């Protein structure tokens, strides 16, 4: 009788345990599907807008001093949902290899366009190395911050290179969080990743968008001589606004020095920087920043609209019009930049390969035409 009672009591427990195990497995499966699938931003569909709609927009574009209300998003800053096989493939592999991309962490509006291939089919992705947590707290950036982030993943350089080789990308941008907690700021980790990528595909263009390493020139030299093609470091904003926009450890003149020294360590490098507009800067300050970058030997510059990622970040002071961005593109070309990418949705890594390759091909064609000797009649 006792044996029968014991069996009667244990049976429901076994059934309950199996049911709980099955439910846990189903829950884990759902979580995995959600992680790999589209997120909320993927479903926020915005209509395509024509230039005529932009020109007819009469909404307020500048927030006056003392105003707290956020500006309404103008039509030229609305984008369509990211779709396509390339986009889905890259996103799925990012999840599998536990890699981070600044495209997602920084909520870039161009993710579908870059991952999908863009106008000329040049696929570009931007991978964020050294984790998803930064030691700095810039007031414009949505990346997580902490004084001491988790340790580096020693397998990341190989995992990153393996993923990139399987994607068949033409151009890859490696960026990273700041790691002031590490003696070398993570410079050796970044350099190793570049070497692993080039070992698998020597033809791929590699751009590194790197921190300032608090002005440590040994770290700058490590990156400059790692085998990369483009050394990028963003100045972000004009000199006057730098203390309010960037982390207190970032300095305007320090950024210029990093860019100057990178070129000195490796004269064959292309150097690049980026400026956000809409934070309250004046035209004169933008002009001076562009000139400072040229004096530092910077070859390429991008200008884009600052967009407030959350309510905790800096508010947008002004939405700059596409016409104004066009002006700065023309001005950048006049100042002698190899290329200037300027537009409301342009980001430092926006279609980097497409802009870069197109510009290089155009310049080569111009040089070829200029050196051709006319045939005798």
From Swiss-Prot:
Respond yes or no to whether keyword Flavoprotein is given for this record: no
- Outline the extent of the Radical SAM core domain: 119-338
Describe the reaction catalysed, as an equation: [[Fe-S] cluster scaffold protein carrying a second [4Fe-4S](2+) cluster] + N(6)-octanoyl-L-lysyl-[protein] + 2 oxidized [2Fe-2S]-[ferredoxin] + 2 S-adenosyl-L-methionine + 4 H(+) = [[Fe-S] cluster scaffold protein] + N(6)-[(R)-dihydrolipoyl]-L-lysyl-[protein] + 4 Fe(3+) + 2 hydrogen sulfide + 2 5'-deoxyadenosine + 2 L-methionine + 2 reduced [2Fe-2S]-[ferredoxin]
Query: What SMART domains does the entry give?
Result: Elp3
- What pathway or pathways are given for this protein in its record? Protein modification; protein lipoylation via endogenous pathway; protein N(6)-(lipoyl)lysine from octanoyl-[acyl-carrier-protein]: step 2/2
Q: Where does [4Fe-4S] cluster 1 bind?
A: 103, 108, 114, 349
The cofactor note reads: Binds 2 [4Fe-4S] clusters per subunit. One cluster is coordinated with 3 cysteines and an exchangeable S-adenosyl-L-methionine.
- Spell out the subcellular localization from the entry: Mitochondrion
Q: Name the enzyme's class.
A: transferase
Pfam families attached to this UniProt entry? LIAS_N, Radical_SAM
Q: Which cofactor does it need?
A: [4Fe-4S] cluster
A single Gene Ontology CC term: mitochondrion
Which EC number applies?
2.8.1.8
Family annotation (InterPro entries): Aldolase_TIM, Elp3/MiaA/NifB-like_rSAM, LIAS_N, Lipoyl_synth, rSAM
* Keywords of this entry: 4Fe-4S, Iron, Iron-sulfur, Metal-binding, Mitochondrion, S-adenosyl-L-methionine, Transferase
* Anything else known: This protein may be expected to contain an N-terminal transit peptide but none has been predicted.
Family stated for the protein in its record? Belongs to the radical SAM superfamily. Lipoyl synthase family.
The record's PANTHER family line, in alphabetical order, gives: LIPOYL SYNTHASE, LIPOYL SYNTHASE, MITOCHONDRIAL
Can you say what this protein is called? Answer: Lipoyl synthase, mitochondrial
Q: Which organism is it from?
A: Drosophila sechellia (Fruit fly)
């Amino acid at each position: 009788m006792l044996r029968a009672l014991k069996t009667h009591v244990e049976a429901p427990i076994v059934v309950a345990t199996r049911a709980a195990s099955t439910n846990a497995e189903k829950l884990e499966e759902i979580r995995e599907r959600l992680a790999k699938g589209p997120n909320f931003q993927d479903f926020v569909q915005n209509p395509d807008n024509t230039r005529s709609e932009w020109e007819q927009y009469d909404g307020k574009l500048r927030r006056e001093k003392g105003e707290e209300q956020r500006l309404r998003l103008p039509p030229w800053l609305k984008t369509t949902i990211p779709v396509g096989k390339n986009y889905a493939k890259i996103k799925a592999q990012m999840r599998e290899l536990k890699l981070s991309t600044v495209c997602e962490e920084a909520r870039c509006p161009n993710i579908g366009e870059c991952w999908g291939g863009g106008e000329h089919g040049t696929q570009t992705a931007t991978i964020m190395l050294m984790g998803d947590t930064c030691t700095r707290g810039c007031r414009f950036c949505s990346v997580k911050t902490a004084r001491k982030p988790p340790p580096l993943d020693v397998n990341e350089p190989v995992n990153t290179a393996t993923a990139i080789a399987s994607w068949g990308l033409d151009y890859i941008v490696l960026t990273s969080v700041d790691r002031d907690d590490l003696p070398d700021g993570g410079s050796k980790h970044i350099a190793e990743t570049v070497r692993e990528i080039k070992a698998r595909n020597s033809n791929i263009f590699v751009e590194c968008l790197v921190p300032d390493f608090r002005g440590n020139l040994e770290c700058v030299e490590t990156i400059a001589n790692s085998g990369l093609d483009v050394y990028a470091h963003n100045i972000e904003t004009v000199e006057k606004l730098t203390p309010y926009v960037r982390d207190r450890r970032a300095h305007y003149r320090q950024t210029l020095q990093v860019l100057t020294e990178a070129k000195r360590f490796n004269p064959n490098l292309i150097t690049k920087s980026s400026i956000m507009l809409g934070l309250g800067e004046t035209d004169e300050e933008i002009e001076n920043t562009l000139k400072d970058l040229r004096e530092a030997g910077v070859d390429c510059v991008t200008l884009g609209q600052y967009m407030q990622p959350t309510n905790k970040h800096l508010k947008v002071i002004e939405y700059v019009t596409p016409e104004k961005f066009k002006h700065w593109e023309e001005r950048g070309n006049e100042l002698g930049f190899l290329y200037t990418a300027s537009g409301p949705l342009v980001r430092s890594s926006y279609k980097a390969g497409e802009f870069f390759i197109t510009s290089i091909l155009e310049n080569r064609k111009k040089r070829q035409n200029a050196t051709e000797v006319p045939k005798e009649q």
